Amino acid sequence: MGGANGKSGLRVWRNARLATMADGVAGLGIVEKGAIATRDGLIIYAGAEASMPALAGPGAETVDCEGRWITPGLIDCHTHLVYAGNRANEFEMRLAGATYEEVARAGGGIVSSVKSLRAANEDELVAQTLPRLDALMAEGVTTVEVKSGYGLDLDNEKKSLRAARRLANERPVTIRTTCLAAHALPPEAKGDKEAFVDLVAGTILPGVAAEKLADAVDGFCEGIAFSPEQIARVFDKARALGLPVKLHADQLSNLHGAALAASYGALSADHLEYTDEAGAAAMAKAGTVATILPGAYYFIRETKKPPVDLFRRHGVKMAVATDSNPGTSPLTSLLLTMNMAATLFGLTVDECLAGVTREAARALGLLDKTGTLEAGKSADLAIWDIERPAELVYRMGFNPLHARIWRGQ
């Protein structure tokens, strides 16, 4: 797979079928007899092999793809990948009939993950996270967003984000970090949400920003978490620090989180099961991506589905992600996630594939760099042993990845 710097001379992948996922092109942007040329980690040509300019010089490396399909490298745009321990015991309690409240009273829930993360050092966090990252990468994932949110004080949020950043030194992958300090109340807050929001906006975000540990700021807007007014204070501080925002919105109730996210020009609003028409319209106007998370819906047995038809009608772009986390979506397969999005929520194959490539890149503010097979983008590719792209969504528990290329290597 090459070194972590991802630099190389000219490489050409020929005799391939391409799903370019180019923006503004119908469907998957398919090129039947295609080729891709890369240099210095960037795509310099993607299109019909017959139309490829004469690029080859001495030392050019050519790969015969033997008719395989090439898509952009997959992107998981919403994960909580860095955590310690697991919550399998809560899973057993819930199967035995315990309610969410009973689990929380027994010391479970997000607070359980906070306790575990605080007890672990940075090296331990990296070591525990790498197998989860490897599982994603084994399915052709080349970019992963990783949130904090189990530290909930300055030192532990920084530890979590530093561990996430270190993943990119350990593996050939692009990592985007998001500070989700406004995730839950830590035990020491003793139920005082206002004081904790003061801490997030006044201390945690500035401290994280000073060390450039976060690419974005997120929050959890929900009755069991933070109110729209509290999230607005967090987002005002993020804006002052020059950081883009994202939001866990309308998952368990409609607090108009989607509209709140849109009012701040959020990159994405995520979950969205209870989003209404006004929220969808606001997102469309703001260009905020709807990130669909079927893993959590499945795992906690939700019954209210995100309003996919509303998003289509208003032209809201949809991304699809694992929401990989220890409590509500212990999922590290983006391929299975696509199948869930199609089966549970009715997304089309084209929507699913766009959702883990182009629209996932858009949800991270990276569409100018990755997410499609176009000249000038990072040479992040996934090469598949399949007859047609629909197989990537249709099959379950099957991985047809032939090769994964990150920055040309």
UniProtKB/Swiss-Prot annotation:
Checking CDD domains in the record gives: Imidazolone-5PH
Positions in coiled-coil regions: none
- Give me the residues that bind N-formimidoyl-L-glutamate, please: Y150, N325, G327
GO process annotations (BP): L-histidine catabolic process to glutamate and formamide; L-histidine catabolic process to glutamate and formate
Domain of life according to the entry: Bacteria
- InterPro entries linked: Amidohydro-rel (IPR006680), HutI (IPR005920), Metal-dep_hydrolase_composite (IPR011059), Metal_Hydrolase (IPR032466)
- Localization per Swiss-Prot or TrEMBL: Cytoplasm
Kindly list the positions annotated as binding Zn(2+): H78, H80, H248, D323
Which residues are noted in the entry as 4-imidazolone-5-propanoate-binding?
R87, Y150, H183, Q251, T328
Pathway annotation from the record? Amino-acid degradation; L-histidine degradation into L-glutamate; N-formimidoyl-L-glutamate from L-histidine: step 3/3
Q: Where does it sit, as one GO cellular component term?
A: cytoplasm
Reported EC number(s) for this entry are 3.5.2.7
Sorted alphabetically, which keywords does the UniProt record give? Cytoplasm, Histidine metabolism, Hydrolase, Iron, Metal-binding, Zinc
Q: Which HAMAP family match?
A: HutI
Record-linked NCBIfam families = hutI
Its family? Belongs to the metallo-dependent hydrolases superfamily. HutI family.
Q: What is this protein called?
A: Imidazolonepropionase
Organism encoding this protein: Mesorhizobium japonicum (strain LMG 29417 / CECT 9101 / MAFF 303099)
Q: What is the lineage of its organism?
A: Bacteria, Pseudomonadati, Pseudomonadota, Alphaproteobacteria, Hyphomicrobiales
- Name the gene behind this protein: hutI
